Amino acid sequence: MFDADKGWSDQLDGKKLSIGIVQARFNEGITNALAEACLRELAALGVDAKNITHLKVPGALEVPCALQALAESENFDALIALGCIIRGETYHFELVANESGSAVTRLALDYQLPIANAILTVENLAQAQARQEEKGRDAARVAVEMANLLYTLA
């Protein structure tokens, strides 16, 4: 997803798309900034606010469960995962990062549904703050582009 705004794509028209967003509340200052940037970019790409479902869950490990519920509804063209995992002093960082990332990827493949993964995994708060705006925008662009790409392949 890095630098999704680089280059050009003709797949960034979001006018007819329905998007689901699942945001972790843990590290809420960062995840709120991710969500705000993501929602602004979705609007800029033409996604109607009434076609966006935005859910909040406790943390990154809960994101996949909510994504699965949205995927099972078959009401969405793409989904977006938002969260922030900051390394601490224990192995918990690796566990949460690996398990949440793996589950998001597995859901995308199992449901053949694009899921833009913007669950940040960073060493410290400064790294998260440096990425919150860009990665929120990137997630919106990835979701719209991949939804449109899969429609062209159907």
From Swiss-Prot:
Pathway in which this enzyme or protein is active: Cofactor biosynthesis; riboflavin biosynthesis; riboflavin from 2-hydroxy-3-oxobutyl phosphate and 5-amino-6-(D-ribitylamino)uracil: step 1/2
Alphabetized Pfam families for the sequence: DMRL_synthase
GO biological process: riboflavin biosynthetic process
Active site, per annotation: 92
An example Gene Ontology molecular-function term: 6,7-dimethyl-8-ribityllumazine synthase activity
Binding-site residues for 5-amino-6-(D-ribitylamino)uracil, renumbered to this chain: 26, 60-62, 84-86, 117
Protein's job: Catalyzes the formation of 6,7-dimethyl-8-ribityllumazine by condensation of 5-amino-6-(D-ribitylamino)uracil with 3,4-dihydroxy-2-butanone 4-phosphate. This is the penultimate step in the biosynthesis of riboflavin.
Gene Ontology cellular-component annotations: cytosol; riboflavin synthase complex
Source taxonomy: Bacteria, Pseudomonadati, Pseudomonadota, Betaproteobacteria, Burkholderiales
Source species: Polaromonas naphthalenivorans (strain CJ2)
Name of protein: 6,7-dimethyl-8-ribityllumazine synthase
Keyword rRNA-binding: no
Cross-referenced HAMAP family: Lumazine_synth
Binding site for (2S)-2-hydroxy-3-oxobutyl phosphate: 89-90, 131
Keywords per UniProt: Riboflavin biosynthesis, Transferase
InterPro entries assigned to the protein according to its UniProt record, in alphabetical order: LS, LS/RS, LS/RS_sf
Gene name tied to this protein: ribH
Similarity remark: Belongs to the DMRL synthase family.
